[in-house]
UniProtKB/Swiss-Prot annotation:
Active site: 183 (proton acceptor)
Family, similarity comment: Belongs to the protein kinase superfamily. Ser/Thr protein kinase family. STKL subfamily.
Protein name according to UniProt: Serine/threonine-protein kinase SBK2
Documented EC number(s): 2.7.11.1
GO molecular function: ATP binding; protein serine kinase activity; protein serine/threonine kinase activity
Domain Protein kinase positions: 62-330
Sequence segments annotated as region (Disordered): 1-26, 329-362
Top-rank taxon, per record: Eukaryota
Length: 362
């Protein structure tokens, strides 16, 4: 899955009036000030952490057990402390592709979030070696969520609801610290057990203080909110806000329930699946749902319509899913097939789907 490419910079509070406008998603001066306070706190933590980095080679203190993950910018290893035998996860970032500031930023964001049951706990140990920077976190041993999502099927409904509830709680916690996560996707969700009972959010390299000006420089992905695809309201970019995470959570919940992406890109002019969704959402008529939305329940429709509102200030916050937990998010057995038959017999919708091709699978 390609990541979002972006340029970002801090925003001055004076550039936006209280209340914002449609392009800003209702971001207020108070919210921007909260983001600035978070940014200042991170700067202070980074300055302190830079002075306390342990100067050593990783293998002198820790023994590698096995790889846990590999990304474009680094790798995660399961290690044990050579003296105490304590198992830990070590994220190692090569100096060739990572600046000291970039390393300190990700390290300190994790530290600033403290302890949360659905966020990987960061330990206050940063290491500078000859060729890399590293930091330590709690180990999560069962891989990431993408390996649990069966393409074109998704997760069992109870597991999907558990994951969604835990991730919404994690995002609320991040937002309460004046930050926007910005990179929600299955690859950044670690699974704690084989039954997928507990998950934890990880990787805070894209997390930024609320109000940071963001300009998208690469192609959008399914999780990219549509306001990032539009011309920015300010020359420097769009002031980011928690509604970006709400959109990504809605897309992820859809993937958990169906095993499909709802669209490739949130662009009406290039993606007919996204266009169909907007038409259906505007109609407010569940019976007109496009495929594969027909497998979802009315409660899931309402939940996802709120999280996936194209207007950011009308979009429901991530915590809105609490009202839908315990309700069915999928049609009962037989109902989805019956609705699919009705859609095929109708002909009009089925013809549209055939013309568009296959829905993108997760």
């Amino acid at each position: 899955m390609p990541g979002k490419q972006s340029e970002d910079k801090p925003m001055e509070v004076s550039t936006v009036e209280d209340g914002g406008d449609e392009g800003l998603g209702g971001l207020t001066v108070e919210e921007l000030q909260q983001g600035q306070e978070a940014a200042l706190a991170l700067e202070d933590m980074m300055a302190l952490s830079a002075q306390t980095l342990v100067q050593t080679e990783v293998e002198e203190l820790y023994e590698e057990v096995r790889p846990l993950g590999q990304g474009r910018f680094g790798r995660v290893l399961l290690v044990t402390h050579r003296q105490k035998g304590t198992p830990l996860a070590l994220k190692q970032l090569p100096k060739q592709s990572t600046s000291l500031r970039g390393f300190l930023y990700e390290f300190c964001v994790g530290l600033s979030l403290g302890t949360h049951s659905a966020i990987v706990t960061a330990y206050g140990i940063g290491i500078e070696s000859a060729n890399s920077y590293s930091f330590l976190t709690e180990p999560v041993l069962h891989g990431d969520l993408i390996t649990f999502i069966q393409p074109k099927v998704g997760l069992p409904q109870p597991a999907a609801q558990r994951c969604a509830a835990q991730l919404a709680s994690a995002l609320e916690h991040i937002h309460s610290h004046g930050l926007v996560y910005r990179d929600l996707k299955p690859e950044n969700v670690l699974v704690c057990d084989p039954a997928c009972q507990r998950v934890k959010l990880t990787d805070f390299g894209h997390t930024r203080p609320r109000g940071t000006l963001l300009r998208l420089t690469g192609p959008p992905i399914p999780y990219t909110a549509p306001e990032l695809c539009a011309p920015p309201p300010l020359p420097e970019g769009l002031p980011i806000q928690p509604s970006l995470d709400a959109w990504a959570l809605g897309v992820l919940i859809f993937c958990l329930l169906t095993g499909y992406f709802p669209w490739d890109q949130p662009l009406v002019e290039v993606d007919p699946f996204f266009e169909d969704f907007l038409i259906w959402q505007a109609s407010g008529q569940p019976q007109d749902r496009p495929q594969p939305w027909y497998s979802l329940s009315p409660a899931a429709d309402t939940l996802l319509w709120g999280l996936l509102d194209p207007h950011p200030r009308k979009r429901n916050p991530v915590g809105s899913i609490k009202s839908y937990l315990g309700q069915p998010w999928k049609q009962r057995e037989g109902e989805a097939e019956e609705l699919a038959t009705e859609l095929r017999e109708d002909g009009w919708r089925g013809g549209q789907e055939a013309a568009k091709g296959e829905q993108p699978a997760c």
